[in-house]
């Protein structure tokens, strides 16, 4: 009888320990699953940001392209201003030459 009581007590202890192991395992698995879900959420968020950054990259590329065009236009305007100055000097010389001919 004592053997049965001891065996029963041991079985209770084993059952209690097994329940604790099951609880800790379930809690650990649950925590792991929650953490995994959170990490996937963070990953999706970061991936969406990267996609938005591609839009920013496209915007920067467009601005650089437009800046290049603007620089080219500024050079052309400067060349036209220089050409206009040369024409102005040429016309002034023609006017001076005509005045001299008229005065002679």
Swiss-Prot record:
The record's section on InterPro entries has: BLI1
UniProt KW keywords: Coiled coil, Endosome, Transport
- Coiled coil segments of this chain: 56-99
Q: Which gene encodes it?
A: BLI1
What does the similarity note say? Belongs to the BLI1 family.
Q: Would you tell me the protein name for this molecule?
A: Biogenesis of lysosome-related organelles complex 1 subunit BLI1
Q: Which cellular component, as a GO term, is one annotated location?
A: endosome
Protein's job: Component of the biogenesis of lysosome-related organelles complex-1 (BLOC-1) involved in endosomal cargo sorting.
At the highest ranks, the source species' classification is: Eukaryota, Fungi, Dikarya, Ascomycota, Saccharomycotina
Organism equals Kluyveromyces lactis (strain ATCC 8585 / CBS 2359 / DSM 70799 / NBRC 1267 / NRRL Y-1140 / WM37) (Yeast)
Assembly, per entry: Component of the biogenesis of lysosome-related organelles complex-1 (BLOC-1).
Compartments where located: Endosome
Major site of localization recorded for this protein: other
